[in-house]
């Protein structure tokens, strides 16, 4: 993440991989992290919170942004549908339907915590749908101690996510 001269938060890594965000009524207002008591400018995730809130991708919770909260499948559906320009203001019902209709997810267990391999699979399907996956963008996962524990459905997506720096290992493991 970085700030532009006009103090707009940018996320060049995700933009490079095609996850550019359509115009939002909130873009450029810098309402972001400054309005959340649980997000401080010194936090490592501050720029990310600014980006997702300034671009209307996330709104936080009733009591703050909740950066330590576990991400659910529904949360990712909502974010991806908003990146795709959908109006998903009803929390997740419309986003769930969008994810099913676009083969991003099967739409099951919305409140379940999302695993790293589920995250990779959904991002990969979205990137494929947008024509953003290049043939040379896959990594060899054999260097990770738990590579064999990656589910078959997510193997190619995990290779793509690692090759493109979307996911990295933790202590020599993928933790799928």
Short names for language-model regions:
Residues 7-23:
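C-terminal beta-strand-rich structural cap/linker in extracellular carbohydrate-active enzymes
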Residues 22-46, 54-118, 123-154, 167-176:
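Feature responds to low-complexity, polar/acidic, surface-exposed segments characteristic
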Residues 158:
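Non-catalytic cell-wall polysaccharide-engagement segments
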Residues 161:
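Histidine- and acidic-residue-rich, metal-dependent catalytic cores
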């Amino acid at each position: 993440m970085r700030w532009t001269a006009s103090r707009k938060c940018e996320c060049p890594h995700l933009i490079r991989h095609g996850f550019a965000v359509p115009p939002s009524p909130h873009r450029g207002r810098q309402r972001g992290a400054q309005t959340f008591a649980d997000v401080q400018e010194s936090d490592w995730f501050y720029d990310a919170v600014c980006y997702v809130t300034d671009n209307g991708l996330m709104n936080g919770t009733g009591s703050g942004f909740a950066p330590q909260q576990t991400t659910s499948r529904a949360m990712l559906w909502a974010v991806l549908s908003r990146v795709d320009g959908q109006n998903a203001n009803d929390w997740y019902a419309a986003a769930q339907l969008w994810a099913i209709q676009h083969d991003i997810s099967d739409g099951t267990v919305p409140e379940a915590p999302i695993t790293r391999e589920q995250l990779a699979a959904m991002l990969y399907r979205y990137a494929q749908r947008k024509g953003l996956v290049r043939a040379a963008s896959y990594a060899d996962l054999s260097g990770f101690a738990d590579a064999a524990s990656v589910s078959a459905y997510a193997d190619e997506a995990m290779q793509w996510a690692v090759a493109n720096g979307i996911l990295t290992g933790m202590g020599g493991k993928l933790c799928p």
